[in-house]
Amino acid sequence: MPSEEAVAQARERAIPVLDAWMTGFNALDLQAWKATMHFPHFRLASGIMHRWEDADMDDTFIARVRTGLGNIGWHYSVWTRREIVHCSDEKIHVDTQFTRYREDGSVVAAHDSLYVLTYEDGRWGIKLRSSFAR
C-alpha cells in the first residue's frame, strides 16, 4: 500500500482529471473528454480491449456513444467511489465506481472500474479504463 502522503499527492493529481473526464462525459463533449485522456487510449469491457488513437474519437464515435447511452435511458453519471490503490510519480491506479442515472433521478446501473492515469507530455491523463460496464 502506498503511504498516506503518496496517496494524498496522487489524489491531488488524479481527482481533477477524473472530475473533468466525468464533466466531459456527461456533456458528451468529445473535445473536453479527450482532453483528459492520453493516446493511444484503452478500455477493457465486456471481454474486449478497445484501443483508440486521438483521430479515432470523432463525430461518428461520439454518435455511437450517445446512441448506446440513449438506449439505456442514461441522462448523467456520477462518481460514487474513487480510491487510490497504487501510485508513483508517473502512474496512478484508481479503484472507482460510477452510477448512471435517468433524467428522473432513478438509477440505471452502478459499475466498478479501474482507471489508470499516467504522466505524459507534462500532464496527467487517463490511459486505461477497465470497466464492468457494457
Can you annotate each of these PLM segments?
Residues 108-134:
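Short beta-strand edge/turn micro-motifs at domain boundaries
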Residues 47-49, 105, 122:
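Detector for glycine-centered tight turns/loop "hinges" at secondary-structure junctions
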Residues 100-108:
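Short, cysteine-centered beta-strand-loop-beta hairpins and adjacent loop/turn segments enriched
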Residues 18-21, 25, 37, 41, ...:
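Hydrophobic alpha-helical core bundles mediating ligand binding, dimerization, or RNAP-core interactions
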Residues 30-84, 90:
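A solvent-exposed, acidic/Ser-Thr-rich amphipathic alpha-helical stretch
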